[in-house]
């Protein structure tokens, strides 16, 4: 019996020690769970408005919401909390003096979904600054002094839905955040209002789905006035997008150092916006989106004949794929107005799209290339021919023989009726006209033995000309045509 009593006493002693340790641990936990200058309520810790220069240490690991706003925090280092806060989903750091955040500052809070860094003194968002926050859904960075946003600052944040960057000094539109929807696929709100944006990537903005444009806020920026900008926001106004409808008076642009409302650009002679129809040609493959203002809506398409378009393509070549209208090969009878009825949990929307079909096919790329090539070759050949005509003289034909001197009789008929050569020998002396350069055209004069009209006088004979030099003029044939009216010189 004695051993049993000793064993029972030992068990009682161990139980007492265990209970004592449990109470001590619970008391210690109650001390750690609520740091000084903080208000604790279950898993919520509020340390706001305490003028804290540093984050309180020994934060309980079960903390789900930590409020450190309205304090004097200036730096958020990598070791700001020695405890890994895996249960923390909301961290409030607004209205502090933060000007530095370590790239490893968010390693202890991997499951954070809500982060408020607004109203601080941040200047730069470095690359991979938030890459450890892969579960983050809402990020508030408004009312800082941000000038530079690195292109990789928001890497690996596939769950981010709302990003607030308003009231900063950003001058470059971070197009990488929205282009193609790959970096932030769930982003539905991007607030860039009240910054220093002057130019927008209009082409990329036009391609965005309506549910992204609906939450893209760009008001209160000194945008450069342009008709393309007017067309962009007019389209958003036509679609009744919240980003435009809620801030119409604050959407302005800058021209000649003056602000103008974007929707009053009459002095630019901008064309009035009209919703354009889709255009297609015979045989084209076409996809028309049901561009709703919300994601995840159920979509139903109705054809111009008021029939529902099914995914199996019961209406000819038309079918529905992933909520979009798909035409395998466009036909003439496919033209008309299609209506998309979109239904969501809290919002319904109706969209109408007009399709115009042209009754011909477009030339292929190969034909277009051939036409352009032919035109180019024709132009080059034309230029070459013109250059040859202008600058290259005809070649002398060396195959022709040397011409023999013609006889006097042959020359009589081919002699010129008008001659610029004086009818005297320039080598003879004693002539009054020697040295006098008079340009006179003569008809062939009559010979000394000729009578009127070049006829021979009776008893006279025709003198034979002597061999002379080049300057000696040959006598004309008395029966030649050139002897007619031969006595009168013509002065030129």
Swiss-Prot record:
GO terms for cellular component: dendrite; membrane; neuronal cell body membrane; pericellular basket; perikaryon. Residues 393-492 are cytoplasmic. The keyword Signal applies. Glycans are attached at residues 72, 269, 315, 348, 359. Residues 269-352 form the Ig-like C2-type domain. LRR repeats lie at residues 62-83, 87-108, 111-132, 135-156, 159-180, 186-206. Residues 28-61 form the LRRNT domain. Keywords: Cell adhesion, Cell membrane, Cell projection, Developmental protein, Differentiation, Disulfide bond, Glycoprotein, Immunoglobulin domain, Leucine-rich repeat, Membrane, Neurogenesis, Phosphoprotein, Repeat, Signal, Transmembrane, Transmembrane helix. It is found in: Cell membrane; Perikaryon; Cell projection, Dendrite. Homodimer, and heterodimer with AMIGO2 and AMIGO3. Interacts with KCNB1. PANTHER family: AMPHOTERIN-INDUCED PROTEIN (PTHR24368), AMPHOTERIN-INDUCED PROTEIN 1 (PTHR24368:SF1). This is Amphoterin-induced protein 1. The gene is Amigo1.
């Amino acid at each position: 019996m004695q051993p049993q009593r000793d064993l029972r006493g030992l068990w009682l002693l161990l139980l007492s020690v265990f209970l004592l340790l449990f109470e001590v641990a619970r008391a210690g936990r109650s001390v750690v769970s609520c740091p000084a200058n903080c208000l604790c309520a279950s898993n919520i810790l509020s340390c706001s408005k305490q003028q804290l220069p540093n984050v309180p240490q020994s934060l309980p690991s079960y903390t789900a919401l930590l409020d450190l706003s309205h304090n004097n925090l200036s730096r958020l280092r990598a070791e700001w909390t020695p405890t890994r806060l895996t249960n923390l989903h909301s961290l409030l750091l607004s209205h502090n003096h933060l000007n530095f955040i370590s790239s490893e500052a968010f390693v202890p809070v991997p499951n954070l979904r809500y982060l408020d860094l607004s109203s601080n003194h941040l200047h730069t968002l470095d690359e991979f600054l938030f890459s450890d926050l892969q579960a983050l859904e809402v990020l508030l960075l408004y009312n800082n002094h941000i000038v530079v946003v690195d292109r990789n600052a928001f890497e690996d944040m596939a769950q981010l839905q709302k990003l607030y960057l308003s009231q900063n000094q950003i001058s470059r539109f971070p197009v990488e955040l929205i282009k193609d929807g790959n970096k932030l696929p769930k982003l539905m709100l991007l607030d860039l209002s009240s910054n220093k944006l002057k130019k927008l990537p209009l082409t990329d903005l036009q391609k965005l789905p309506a549910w992204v444009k609906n939450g893209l806020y760009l008001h209160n920026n000194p945008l450069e006035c342009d008709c393309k900008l007017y067309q962009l926001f007019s389209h958003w106004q036509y679609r009744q997008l919240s980003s435009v409808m809620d801030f119409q008076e604050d959407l302005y642009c800058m021209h000649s150092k003056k602000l103008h409302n974007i929707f009053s650009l009459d002095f630019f002679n901008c064309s009035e916006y009209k919703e354009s129809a889709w255009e297609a040609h015979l045989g084209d493959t076409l996809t028309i989106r049901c561009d709703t203002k919300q994601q995840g809506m159920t979509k139903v398409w109705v054809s111009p004949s008021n029939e529902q378009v099914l995914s199996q393509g019961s209406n000819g070549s038309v079918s529905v794929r992933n909520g979009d209208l798909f035409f395998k090969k466009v036909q003439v009878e496919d033209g008309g107005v299609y209506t998309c009825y979109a239904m969501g949990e809290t919002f319904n929307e109706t969209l109408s799209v007009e399709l115009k079909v042209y009754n011909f096919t477009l030339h292929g790329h190969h034909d277009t290339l051939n036409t352009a090539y032919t035109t180019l070759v024709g132009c080059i050949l034309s230029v070459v021919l013109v250059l040859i005509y202008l600058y290259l003289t005809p070649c002398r034909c060396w195959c022709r023989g040397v011409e023999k001197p013609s006889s006097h009789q042959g020359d009589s008929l081919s002699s010129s009726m008008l001659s610029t050569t004086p009818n005297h020998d320039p080598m003879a002396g004693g002539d009054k006209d020697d040295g006098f350069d008079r340009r006179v055209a003569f008809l062939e004069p009559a010979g000394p033995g000729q009578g009127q009209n070049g006829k021979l006088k009776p008893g006279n004979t025709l003198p034979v000309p002597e061999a002379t030099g080049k300057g000696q003029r040959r006598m004309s044939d008395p029966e030649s045509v050139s002897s007619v009216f031969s006595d009168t010189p013509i002065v030129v």
